[in-house]
Amino acid sequence: DCKILIIEKEQKIGMHGSGRNSGVLHSGIYYPPHTLKAKFCAEGSRLMTNYCKEYKLPILKCGKVILPTKRQDYDQVDLLYERGTINGASVEIISQKELLEIEPEANPAIERALYSPNTSVVDSFAVLNKIQFELINLGVKILFNEEVILANPDQSTVKTNRGSSFKYAHLINCTGQYSDRVSKFFNVGKQYTLLPFKGLYYGLHKNSNIQINGLIYPTPDLSMPFLGVHSVRLVDGSVYFGPTAIPAFGRENYQGLKGVNIKDATSISYHLLRQYAGNKQGFRSYAHQELHKLFKSEFLKSMQKLVPRLSDSNL
């Protein structure tokens, strides 16, 4: 018996989306004003920044520049500036000279860019461990190695793979890549199927002569849910470039064929082919563009639009 119970299918926290991320605290630049995404992103960034400062968790305020890599992208800079300002983010449009003072390795051909000086990076695992510590102290019970495999909404119960059964008053579905499956236990979202994508990164060699001070992003295609390959500076000072956005043929297919099973791979392939054939929101051209980045040479070309001096030997 407990007031709050967390059922965790893994043996420890942060094994999936909560731990497998760059730790960037976005400030609400990308989302249309007055939307929930804009509101939660801006407020969430502020709250997480204060949380890290209060508990002395690692946080790096390194700033972010967003660069237009094509002539038509300059309009996007103005749009993002407008959105960011309305959403309460600290943003400014900077000149070529100002850009190169902030990021000397940035493409010198870029005439103006968007600058978000307050964008920060946190250590995701440090945050998770602190939250876990606080929750346990508050009496929250966490069950590890327990996976919900069945639910009975009429009786307000869930059953796990270990034969345990739990009755609830309120249930929150925060199962990440399995959220669509769990929702269907409750007859919710039956028309939806989650398509997993994964991002691949390259690290910058520590002895490289390329100096990246913060985050360097391209102006994004706002019709897509991805921000394009960019630079990320972590709290320990290491720098990574990525991520790509390629289909994963399993909900935990992080590397090679690990996490792939025939049933999931078949279902995912079917839905991807439907998306490709239907070409909704330009999915087909985007797929071609992203698949090219599986080759290191093509990935490098994308990054060189932002950081021209970057070479194969740096990655």
Regions found by a protein language model. Name each.
Residues 8, 61, 95-96, 144-146, ...:
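Short loop/edge segments at beta-strand edges and connector loops
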Residues 189-191, 207-209, 234-238, 244-315:
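Flavin-binding catalytic cores
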